Amino acid sequence: FVMLDLDIGMQDWLTAPFAWDDAHRMDRGKVMTAAELEAGRDFGRYLDVDGDGIPFRTYPGTHPTKGSFFTRGTSKDRYARYTEEGPAYVDNMQRLLRKFETAKARVPAPVITKAVKPTKSAVVWFGSTSAAMAESLAALELDGIHLDQMRIRAFPFADAVAEFVAAHEHVFVVEQNRDAQM
């Protein structure tokens, strides 16, 4: 297997046909409607109303005068108004920390596979390295090298990622980034 993102992205790859259920409705999260805006519901693009760090949003064009916003960088308040005030910056950073904690419990958990024999060594990978890892792990098994395995599927990392790493003396991280992205 050639382990190149470029190869994956530029070549035609065969897959099993995708199945789609036309009755399925996507959960789009906290989206404020035109009716809610018209009724005067408080909309702040960075306003955390329930403590999970994830604010409501609107779709472009939802309402002709309400629900739109413009922002730049991190110098903004809960209502996307420009500010250089320290407390507003701290408030936004604390909201982002809450958002990350919320997301850790909602994103797909890592896939953890125990080695066929007890080991204190492990390997961690993610993304397009998966096919190469399957091939490599099979070859290592034939050579008598057994590794616990974890395929990370999302960021921010679930608590299980830190627990997995802490449980091993040696952890090999396989990725395709010169500067150790993971």
Model-based region annotation:
Residues 1-182:
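Flexible, low-complexity linker and terminal segments
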